[in-house]
């Protein structure tokens, strides 16, 4: 999602202007362009999946820089209070890792996907609602609203909801794991294995 920057319309389709607000978005666009150019010019098969917030087992949870959802789960499991910037009202499209892996497998094996770009998503939810679902699954947990620091406010993209109709139509992919089921599977995994990820 970081390739798009602030959404000019929702849901965001693959034709949405690419206006990243941070260097990660710029890097994602550059990587995508290189791969698709190699596909077109040199015949090296490539497809680009524009992923959104992904969570699940085996994802790092030490910090919030990559994978804020797993970091939230870690903080709640450690009985720490989460500070949600802006009250966590911003909507993110969320995918459980198994659904992302499924999309990668399908796209990688499909001739129709060659040279294409697809959005992943399908589970839009506010960050506060995600945290509430985790606290419900754990049976405990707290969060509080915090202000955006200036450096974070400058790169905050606001709401993001992906239009996944292209990948649904062309590759018959859509998420199968609900956010609630994914949270339960993630918590179950980290109850046994969290020490390896800290």
What residues fall within each predicted segment?
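Conserved active-site helix of classical SDR/Rossmann-fold NAD(P)-dependent CH-OH oxidoreductases
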Residues: 29-36, 69-73, 101-102, 128
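A conserved pocket-lining segment of Rossmann-fold NAD(P)-dependent short-chain dehydrogenase/reductase
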Residues: 15-19, 46-61, 71-95, 119-121
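Short, structured secondary-structure boundary patches
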Residues: 18, 68-71, 166, 197-198
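C-terminal substrate-binding subdomain of Rossmann-fold SDR/epimerase-dehydratase oxidoreductases
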Residues: 76-198
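Catalytic helix-loop patch of NAD(P)-dependent Rossmann-fold dehydrogenases
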Residues: 2-48, 55, 60, 64
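Conserved catalytic/ATP-binding subdomain
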Residues: 63-67, 125
